[in-house]
């Protein structure tokens, strides 16, 4: 089952592609964009830590945008490489840690935040390991990385606009869906490897 975000990504590729082509023509490397995404994620983390949640959200969006563009720039500029893939995957994990662990500064339980980080990383690990074994994992599970970033964005938005309590309820839902995705991916890989 292909996730909703995977389908949306395929549709918005038409929007990202012209921007990626422009950046490629300007000789902006995909690896630079990947690094920029990490820098924005670090700034996001520190802005949340400093209780500048609105500014934090802005940098979260910038970071996520870099993540959406870097691979397309590499493809358009024909600079896809093992190094780029390694950087992208590794820095994505660091960004995931920053995105979610910043919730501690909103007053969320550090234990629950640590579990959420662990679950998120486990989802990514299962995909990476499965794909290293030749299994396709895109679209497996109800909350892929893109959806998790959207959840982080909405949780922060609700924290500002509504209340901490409402954002906390959404965080609990985020944790539940993340745990379900771990189970879904584990089961999918287990089933495929047993055949």
Curated annotation (Swiss-Prot):
Details of cofactor binding: Binds 2 Mg(2+) or Mn(2+) ions per subunit.
EC nos: 2.7.8.39
Binding site for Mg(2+) 2: 67, 88, 92
Keyword annotations: Cell membrane, Lipid biosynthesis, Lipid metabolism, Magnesium, Manganese, Membrane, Metal-binding, Phospholipid metabolism, Transferase, Transmembrane, Transmembrane helix
Transmembrane segments: 28-48, 54-74, 97-117, 149-169, 170-190
Reaction(s) the record says it catalyses: CDP-2,3-bis-O-(phytanyl)-sn-glycerol + 1D-myo-inositol 3-phosphate = saturated 1-archaetidyl-1D-myo-inositol 3-phosphate + CMP + H(+)
Full protein name: Archaetidylinositol phosphate synthase
Organism phylogeny: Archaea, Thermoproteota, Thermoprotei, Sulfolobales, Sulfolobaceae
């Amino acid at each position: 089952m292909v996730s909703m975000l995977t389908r949306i990504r395929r549709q918005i590729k038409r929007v990202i592609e012209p921007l990626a082509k422009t950046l490629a023509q300007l000789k902006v490397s995909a690896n630079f964009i990947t690094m920029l995404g990490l820098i924005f994620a670090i700034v996001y983390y520190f802005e949340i830590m400093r209780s500048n949640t609105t500014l934090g959200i802005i940098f979260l969006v910038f970071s996520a945008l870099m993540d959406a563009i870097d691979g397309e720039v590499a493809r358009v500029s024909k600079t896809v490489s093992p190094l780029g893939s390694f950087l992208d995957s590794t820095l994505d994990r660091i960004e995931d840690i920053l995105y979610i662990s910043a919730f501690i500064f909103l007053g969320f339980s550090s234990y629950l935040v640590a579990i959420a980080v662990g679950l998120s990383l486990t989802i990514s690990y299962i995909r990476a390991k499965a794909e290293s074994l030749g299994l396709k994992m895109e679209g497996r599970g109800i909350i892929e990385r893109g959806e998790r970033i959207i959840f982080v964005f909405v949780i922060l938005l609700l924290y500002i606009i509504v209340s901490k309590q409402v954002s906390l309820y959404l965080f609990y839902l985020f944790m539940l869906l993340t745990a379900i995705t771990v189970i879904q991916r584990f089961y999918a890989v287990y089933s495929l490897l047993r055949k």
